[in-house]
């Protein structure tokens, strides 16, 4: 039996590298998309990406594709997300795509090309191919990792108050978390540390809030069995009698 590499039936499908780049902007989680000028899906919004070149690794390819849209150094984290191989995902012919998840911290405001913009993940425009579904997969990955890993470092500025960090987690998770519980959990896991400094006082005055930072900007699993869950809301009328 001949080798698959010498077989005339050896597949020769184009392989693409795509990137889902997320950032919390104005208290909402956004995805970076670009508007396609040509068919298929002219006028629809797509993820940054393109074909894998000969001799190029997937990691090198996604970095090259991203460089056309955003300064790669702005990313706080980049990891491989998933591979899509549905035969019908591209009307021009079969393609395989490997998607990456990238995160940009809030203190960075990258300059984007004219065809590229940030869109709230909970209100995406019409997307090309299966890119809307890939964004949803990236969102699920991020929410899962916020529960068991320290990936919040890639969304946060170098220093922050607990209230500011809570806003980032609420935007990314899609539901409310209390600042007190978030602080308690992350300190217990050894993820946060106080800087010893305080934030400038607000307009209302009061005691200045303490500043914190993530202990490391390297991804690590801090609690493999942990899961953040949305608060349980009791149905109306389900309470103790007065």
Model regions: which residues?
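Core subunits and conserved enzymes of cellular information-processing
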Residues: 1, 5-6, 24-26, 31-32, ...
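N-terminal strand-loop-strand
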Residues: 6-45
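NUDIX/MutT-family hydrolases
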Residues: 99-102, 110-146, 155-163, 168, ...
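Active-site segment of metal-dependent pyrophosphate-handling enzymes
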Residues: 13-20, 30, 59-63, 67-111, ...
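Short helix-coil junctions and helix-kink-helix linkers
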Residues: 167-176
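Long, intrinsically disordered, low-complexity Ser/Thr/Pro-rich regulatory/activation regions
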Residues: 194-242
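Active-site-proximal cofactor/substrate-binding loop regions of enzyme domains
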Residues: 39, 47-48, 55-58, 62
């Amino acid at each position: 039996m001949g080798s698959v590499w010498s077989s005339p039936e050896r597949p020769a499908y184009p392989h693409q590298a795509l990137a889902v780049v997320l950032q919390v902007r104005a208290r909402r989680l956004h995805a970076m998309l670009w508007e396609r000028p040509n068919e298929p899906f002219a006028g629809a919004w797509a993820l940054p990406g393109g074909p894998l070149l000969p001799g190029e690794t997937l990691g090198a390819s996604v970095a090259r594709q991203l460089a056309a849209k955003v300064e790669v150094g702005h990313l706080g984290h980049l990891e491989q997300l998933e591979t899509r191989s549905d035969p019908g995902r591209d009307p021009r012919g079969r393609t395989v795509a490997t998607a990456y998840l990238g995160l940009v911290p809030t203190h960075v405001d990258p300059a984007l090309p004219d065809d590229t913009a940030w869109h709230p993940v909970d209100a995406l425009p019409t997307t090309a191919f299966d890119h809307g579904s890939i964004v949803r997969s990236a969102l699920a990955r991020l929410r899962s990792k916020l529960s068991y890993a320290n990936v919040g470092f890639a969304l946060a500025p170098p220093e922050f108050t607990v209230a500011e960090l809570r806003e980032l987690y609420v935007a990314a998770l899609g539901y409310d978390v209390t600042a007190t519980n978030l602080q308690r959990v992350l300190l217990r896991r050894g993820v946060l540390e106080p800087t010893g400094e305080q934030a400038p006082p607000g307009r209302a005055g009061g005691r200045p809030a303490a500043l914190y930072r993530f202990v490391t900007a390297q991804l690590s699993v801090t609690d493999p069995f942990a899961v953040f869950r949305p608060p349980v809301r009791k149905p109306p009328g389900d309470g103790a009698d007065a």
